């Protein structure tokens, strides 16, 4: 199965309202054809990065469960949505724009796709909290395990394949 089909199937499996609108937007705005701006710089790199981030996030969560068996697992739909859509705004060609996590979350909202507060924080702050210490949501984001997992998986994916195709 191609990455595109895996991503679409996984997003559909979340059974979230308006997920078809999000998928249609992804297809019509080249999510599956574009490269990332800083890593995965090749046609289809954005989709590859999204899928790798998702796979790494699942691995991180499994490792967390192994180390801390009494801690509840993250919601699988939330993990899929945040890992696969954290760079959603890149499909519109908006590269090198500061605040792309915020833009991604807002674009999803504009499409009528509801994000929980934790999902919003995970997408909004997936890059880092380093430059956001004074942001009113920074403490909530800092405490979000979902945000931490997406951030770490995104960072690992970007560093694993910087400039090369998988």
Segments (PLM) and residue ranges:
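Metal-dependent phosphohydrolase cores
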Residues: 1-166
